[in-house]
């Protein structure tokens, strides 16, 4: 929950010999608000995960009340900014459905939320079909494809 934590984590992983292009930094949309810091993270090659879509629409974050979270429109704006800088192949998105109350059955936004609400918003904001496809299909596929250790340079 500290804005410097992602870079500290990446430094530790790098010093341990990790291949940073296989690392996902989750919850960046609630941790990193400074675009210079986001750029520094992106330049490592790690995946940039904005995974709180549909969560905390008021911007209030109970785990750190001093932070005012982005809403979904702000998240999409940040994603557009990342795309403009050439980081499309590093972007991951999700909605962090970890509790029953987030399911549609219990009044939450549900699993369909990204396809029903966020993808159309991305298109309205000028994110191309190719870029949406890369974020929704290409990047998860690349991340989840096993890589033989000999093909995984440190």
Give residue spans per PLM region:
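Structural preference for beta-strand elements that scaffold enzyme active sites
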Residues: 20-24, 45-49, 90-92
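Divalent metal-binding pocket/active-site signature
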Residues: 1-32
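Active-site glycine- and acidic-residue-rich loops that bind
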Residues: 23-35, 55-79
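Short acidic/histidine-rich active-site segments
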Residues: 50-52, 86-108
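Active-site beta-loop-alpha junctions enriched in small/polar residues
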Residues: 1-2, 26-31, 51-55, 97-100
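Acidic (Asp/Glu)-rich catalytic clusters
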Residues: 11-18, 38-45, 82-88
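A general structural detector for well-ordered alpha-helical segments in enzyme core domains, enriched
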Residues: 9-12, 37, 75-82, 114, ...
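Mid-to-C-terminal alpha-helical segments outside catalytic/metal-binding sites
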Residues: 113-154
């Amino acid at each position: 929950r500290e804005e410097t934590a992602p870079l500290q984590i990446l430094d530790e992983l790098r010093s341990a010999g990790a291949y940073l292009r296989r690392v996902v930094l989750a919850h960046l949309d609630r941790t990193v608000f400074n675009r210079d810091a986001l750029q520094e993270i992106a330049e490592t090659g790690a995946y940039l995960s904005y995974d709180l879509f549909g969560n905390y629409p008021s911007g209030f974050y109970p785990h750190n009340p001093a932070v005012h979270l982005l809403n979904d429109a702000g998240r999409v704006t940040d994603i557009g900014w990342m795309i403009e800088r050439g980081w499309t192949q590093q972007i991951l998105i999700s909605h962090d459905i970890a509790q029953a109350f987030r399911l549609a059955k219990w009044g939450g936004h549900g699993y369909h939320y990204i396809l029903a609400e966020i993808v159309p918003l991305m298109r309205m904001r000028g994110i191309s079909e190719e870029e949406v496809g890369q974020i929704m299909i290409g990047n998860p596929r690349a991340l989840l494809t096993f890589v033989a250790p000999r093909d995984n340079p440190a």
